[in-house]
A protein has these predicted regions:
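Non-catalytic, mostly N-terminal accessory regions of nucleic-acid modification and defense proteins
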Residues: 1-210, 277-288, 399-402, 426-433, ...
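Conserved Class I SAM-dependent methyltransferase catalytic core
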Residues: 29-42, 332-417, 708
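Short acidic (Asp/Glu) and glycine-rich catalytic loops that position anionic groups and cofactors
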Residues: 182, 244, 274-278, 323-329, ...
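Conserved S-adenosyl-L-methionine
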Residues: 188-299, 303-320, 343, 368-370, ...
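Feature representing long, continuous alpha-helical segments
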Residues: 233, 262, 299-301, 343-347, ...
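Extended hydrophobic-aromatic, low-complexity segments
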Residues: 307-310, 357-362, 373-376, 397-398, ...
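Short, contiguous acidic/charged loop-to-helix segments that flank catalytic cores in large enzymes
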Residues: 312-317, 323, 328-340, 370-380, ...
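Flexible, glycine-/basic-rich loop-and-beta segments that form/coincide
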Residues: 406-507
Length: 725
């Protein structure tokens, strides 16, 4: 489409808002009028040439008592029609009744267009337009002879020929209007569509490698986050071009935003596609095509956006682990963080791949950097990457220039996924760094400040097709991105010693120690005799200080039985201390044996909980103490208790032996460490920028000094005088 003509149409439609809607609607509501009326004007322009035929055919159907209007499609030439007697042009013939006639005009549309009108919520605006008297002005503007929204050439008021507006060109107009309205309203500019050059790149990579495999027949193209349908349209256009129109392509999509869904549906109708192939609603919570599989899939799903609203449809209980908790089979592999659902869209596409055809399925999808590396081994994100890579479906990842999108300046990447790789690609993944392949824009569009030209797209496509390494193309084995996350444990080392302070701690129950200590400080030993007379004061203290205790803890705090039980435990500990003295024991294993022996000798009645309380009060971690033994196995192997505070993890690349790595990287520095093999888990991440990092050594002191003194010459020797002084 001619850029000048495109700009003229967009500017004219944009100006209608200020010319007609100012003071009638707030600026944020302009889009609610302009977008649906632009769609309707386009549909009207398409139907005008066959209007009389449709009216005649409809009259015949009425005469024959035939309610099914499907036959009208044959007369209109499109999968939609309008059986009212009005067009946009004829609505202006009766200015006094234009509002009533407009409603009749809208009612005359076929059911599929009625749904579009409904999704735009257009009828909600008609009363306001009527009261303000702007309906005629709006229709008049849209019928202006200076712009052409029809698919045919027309003459303007000067007799000049205005070029036809193709379906593709109309799509561009819609998307630019959406972008401008979003930008005007400080919304996500471009949230619902992708820059055309990025779609062009995606379609090149998607179709070029298999163009010779595409035969006569029908192929299905799918976008699970289709927005206004631009990606589907471009994909079909390029697919037809690259295959010399020898195959048919059917477009399928799903969109959650009602406005962009309406635009997409109207675009499909205009092109003769089935509007029912565009599903409305959330792809994640309500799959529009649960039983279909597709040949080609491409998408730019939302990233960094929560899927909380879809959660109930996907899982039974978010807190529970395991695939049995996941309702939707598309997502059985794993669930990403609730704050970012982009990888769920990828898994939705993966679930719809064809496995029983020669070509299989090909996917091109845009993600931000977090999809490459976010998530620990065993977590949802890592499990999704693991599933795709270990099935050998990931072909390539292409890093795009920053600020190439309208709504974000963060790094973005195209993933190419295929379940029928070429032989040369099997077991390998290609990374292409296209971050520097762009040309600056003269004026920013939202956050978009650059664009890819055809030369850049051709360069990337050639790199992909050649499958060779270069400065901006790297090829790695699948295993290169995987690692084993091992848990490194170190032994618990404890020392024990009876001290007056440690024994005194036992006076108070650990779970309510602070509250018991306050009560004892204020009421002393009387608490052991008659605590009831202090209950009111204790409760007043709790209320005043807003202390919230569990009912069971509050009961213990006010219980004489509990106070005396703690006193008995403290007194028992004192008897043990009298027996063992104040010696420090640095071998916990021997100490516990001695402690139990002493308790037995003193005939003390201490339960398991009480014994633990005593040990906890007199024991602390000491790196110089002996290791605490957990158990000794039959063969004599000693298993030590692990110190959770010293627990660490290491990521061992899959191509390295875990034990060799452990000896080299861990035992050399921490001789008493060991691996808890029960916790070893495999993960995958793609640290894209690391693979293309070029180390630049710092300049030498001599070089820097020479440069400084070279600059010093320009300052009349001042620096030299300072240095010499």
């Amino acid at each position: 489409m001619n850029q000048k003509v495109h700009n003229q149409i967009v500017s004219f439609i944009w100006s209608i808002a200020d010319d007609v809607l100012r003071d009638v609607f707030v600026r944020g509501k302009y889009r609610d009028i302009i977008l649906p009326f632009t769609v309707l004007r386009r549909l009207d322009a398409l139907l005008v040439p066959t209007k009389d035929k449709v009216l005649e055919a409809n009259a015949f159907l009425i005469q024959q008592n035939i309610d099914d209007k499907k036959a009208l499609e044959n007369q209109s030439g499109y999968p939609f029609w309008n059986i009212s007697r009005f067009t946009f042009e004829t609505l202006m013939n009766d200015a006094d009744n234009i509002d009533t006639n407009l409603e009749a005009y809208l009612d005359g549309y076929s059911p599929n267009v009625q749904e579009i009108i409904s999704k735009f919520k257009l009828r909600n605006q008609l009363e306001t337009m009527k009261e303000a008297g702007v309906t005629y002005l709006l229709i008049e503007k849209l019928c202006n002879k200076e712009i052409n929204l029809s698919p045919n050439e027309v003459k303007n008021s000067k007799g000049e020929t205005l070029p036809p507006l193709t379906n593709l060109g109309m799509g561009y107009v819609f998307e630019e209007l959406i972008r401008k309205f979003n930008e005007e309203n400080n919304e996500e500019a471009g949230e619902h569509f992708t820059p055309r050059e990025i779609i062009k790149l995606m379609t090149h990579i998607l179709f070029t490698p298999v163009k010779d495999k595409i035969k006569k027949g029908t192929y299905l193209i799918y976008d699970p986050a289709c927005g206004s349908g631009g990606m589907l349209t471009e994909a079909e256009h390029f697919a037809m071009e690259v295959t010399n129109n020898k195959a048919d392509f059917m477009l399928y999509g799903q969109e959650v935003n009602p406005e962009t869904y309406a635009i997409c549906t109207s675009d499909m109708l205009i092109k003769g596609e089935k509007s029912e192939n565009i599903a409305y609603g959330s792809t994640l919570s309500k799959d529009g095509f649960p039983h279909l599989h597709f040949d080609f899939m491409l998408s730019n799903p939302p990233y960094g956006k929560t899927w909380k609203i879809d959660e109930d449809a996907i899982v039974n209980d978010r807190g529970k682990k395991g695939s049995q908790n996941i309702k939707d089979n598309r997502f059985q592999i794993g669930l990403p963080s609730i704050s970012d659902g982009q990888l769920l869209f990828l898994m939705n596409m993966v679930s719809k791949m064809k496995h029983n055809t020669e070509m299989g399925s090909r996917i091109a999808t845009v993600h931000n950097g977090s999809a490459l590396f976010t998530g620990d081994a065993g977590g949802g994100e890592s499990e999704i990457r693991k599933y795709i890579i270990e099935n050998d479906w990931l072909e390539c990842i292409i890093a795009l220039p920053k600020n190439i999108f309208y709504n974000t300046g963060i790094p973005t990447y195209i993933w190419i996924v295929s379940n029928k790789k070429d032989t040369k690609r099997k077991g390998k993944v290609q990374l292409i760094n296209a971050m520097d392949l762009y040309e600056k824009l003269r004026k920013n569009l939202g956050q978009k400040n650059c664009e890819m030209k055809s030369v850049h797209i051709d360069t990337i496509t050639k790199l992909y097709m050649d499958f060779v390494e270069s400065d901006i193309s790297k090829i790695y084995t699948n295993e290169y991105f995987g690692y084993n996350k091992i848990t490194v444990e170190r032994p618990l080392r404890l020392s024990s010693k009876f001290t007056p302070e440690a024994i005194e701690i036992l006076r108070f129950d650990k779970s309510i120690a602070e509250e018991m200590e306050w009560a004892y400080t204020h009421f002393g030993n009387d608490l052991y005799k008659d605590i009831k007379k202090y209950n009111a004061k204790i409760e007043a203290y709790l209320n005043k200080n807003e202390v919230k205790l569990k009912p069971s803890d509050k009961s213990k705090l006010l219980s004489a039985l509990n106070w005396n039980k703690q006193l008995e435990l403290m007194q028992a500990a004192q008897k043990i201390a009298d027996k063992l003295g104040d010696k420090q024991f640095d071998d916990f294993n021997k100490f516990v044996h001695l402690l139990n022996k002493t308790i037995k000798e003193l005939k003390l009645n201490i339960d398991v909980k009480g014994l633990k309380s005593i040990i906890d009060s007199i024991t602390w971690k000491n790196e110089d103490a002996e290791r605490v033994i957990k158990k000794t196995e039959k063969g004599g192997t000693i298993i030590y208790e692990a110190d959770s505070d010293l627990r660490d993890t290491e990521n061992v690349p899959l191509d390295q032996d875990i034990q060799e790595y452990f000896v080299r990287e861990v035992l050399q520095h921490i001789p008493d460490a060991w691996i808890d093999e029960s916790k070893t888990v495999k993960g995958y991440e793609i640290s894209f920028t690391r693979y293309f990092y070029n180390y630049l050594p710092p300049r030498s002191i001599e070089e820097i000094t020479a440069e400084i003194f070279e600059l010093e010459k320009e300052t009349d020797g001042i620096l030299n005088e300072i240095v010499n002084d």
